[in-house]
Amino acid sequence: MEAQAGFDTFIEATRYLFRGPSPQEILLLIIVLGALITVVSLPFFYSKLKEKQRIRENFFRRARDFDLTEEEASVLWKYVKETVLNPNLVFENKAVFEKVVDRIVQNGNPEEIKLISSIRMKLRFSSLPWFIPLTSTRDIEVYQTGVLVVRNRRVDAYVYDKDEEFLYIALLEPVVVKPGERVSFFFLRENDARYSFDATVEKVFNEGGRTVIVVRHTSEIKRIQLRESVRWKVKLPVKFTLLKENGEEINAEGQLEDISVKGARVCFEGRLDIKEGDRILLDFTLKNYTFKNLLGTVVHQIVYEKRTCLGIKFEELSRKEEEVIGQFILEEQRKLLKAYKEGEV
């Protein structure tokens, strides 16, 4: 009997062990898990909320540093927080700023669009120094000349005017252009690159006897680098020796007007017997480093009324000399960029 009782107890225990949970037990489990998840996740979400508040406070504090009004800062914050992870980039990075401007214009609120010019001026993005590439058609200077291509016809043109929404291009030749047509504008930015962009004509009107087309601004702007390396403007005294094919050497002095790791521009008063392909030796000092007998080749020359300028390609630049020039240009870029952001240029 005892054995039978023990067996019955074992069977009953097994049934209890393998039976499904009751509704009450399931509910209790859900409550316990929910409480556990809440306890674990609450600090995480709280920290995220505090982080968002901190980012927003820092953003508006930085906006006040640039004298933005509360309305201007609020409009900027509204769009920049959906554009980049670090909203403060809009105060430093012009490409980010132009993306935000695009979003404001696309939204089409006239009251917000009116604020862009004031914000742009306060952030010192109204114009670009020559060494910073264009990132939007808004960066193109008024009176910039170029070529407009419409229906495979090339027409000389220039930027007549611009605002935050539109670019106005005046045509220098008579040609019929209609709203809705696709056009391309090509232009050369001095000491920088060749640029082009495509657009759809929004409006056409006549001003002063010329046809003016209106296109929307775009950040889809193509850039073709003019040179392999950055060429930096300088004003340094230079002595040079021209090595003529007949063995004659011509010594002269002038001014180094720009330099890169690939070459330089040298200008001097008057004229000399020079032709493209002539070899030249340069002596000058850059960043406390003296370049002695730096060999180059004259690749082009421009003769003005009272002076001559030579484009020179370096032939035998040592690693040390290349490092000195490269470091000089990098430091000058940083200094000029800082001065630009501080409103000094």
From Swiss-Prot:
Residues 225-330 form the PilZ domain. One of its GO terms (cellular component) is membrane. It is a single-pass membrane protein. The chain crosses the membrane at residues 24-46. It is found in: Membrane. One of its GO terms (molecular function) is cyclic-di-GMP binding. Keywords: Membrane, Transmembrane, Transmembrane helix. Pfam families: PilZ. Signal peptide: none annotated. This is Uncharacterized protein aq_1917.
